Amino acid sequence: MKKEFRAVPRPDDIEGMERDLRFHPSTTETPQVLSPGQIESFNRDGFLKNLKIYEDGQIAPIRSFFDELLQRTLASGEDSYSISTAHLLHGTVWDILTHPPIVAIARDVLGPDVIGWGSHFFCKMPGDGKAVAWHQDASYWPMTPSRTATIWLAVDKADLSNACMKFIAGSHHQGHLTWRPSGEEENNVLNQTVDNAESFGEIVPIELEAGEASIHSDLLLHGSDA
């Protein structure tokens, strides 16, 4: 029987898999762009932030591209969170995914052989009232062992005033945590919530300038306010 291809797996597909959901620290001894101290910090805290990827003159046309893509998406009836796997459709997104500084950071954290398998344009519209509850990316991804990371590139300035992402430092050492389906009253962009997440470590706001990036482990608890 021919199987249906899905870029984003269904929750039932993932729940039925046997997976190694432990944090596997970076063992890179000769990093390309990160310092040994940054590697140590990633292993300890589960993330790095304020990594300069693009200069102002480079990020401006990328922002313009995404503004146009967003307008086309909204005009088609989709919402601002629906632009997923865009690297398969748009050369600009592919160029970002394969941008040498981004690939070098991924290799320093994950090892020399990396696959950029996904992309998601995550855009909060002013006043939409949606939050992102505390969650772990590993809950959504069919990867084993758990050696996957997310690189977030800011195409505009992200700070507490516009609900930047927040990480819970060190929470990746807890393994895969129990989650529950999010309630409608949470107005969650996603569909999972880890309760009492603050008990697993310090909350760190990830404020980025346009052109900067962060990287975090797929087991790190993170979310953002409305």
Model-found features: residue ranges?
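Non-heme Fe(II)-dependent double-stranded beta-helix
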Residues: 1-45, 50-143, 179-180
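Pocket-edge structural micro-motifs
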Residues: 51-52, 118, 153, 169, ...
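Active-site region of the double-stranded beta-helix
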Residues: 112, 138, 153-164, 170-172
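Double-stranded beta-helix
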Residues: 21-22, 160-225
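Short beta-turn/strand-loop junction motif enriched in small, turn-promoting residues
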Residues: 137-139, 156, 221-225
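Juxtamembrane helix-loop transition sites at the ends of transmembrane segments
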Residues: 67, 73, 156, 187-190
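Short, conserved beta-strand element in jelly-roll/cupin
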Residues: 135, 142-160, 207-210, 215
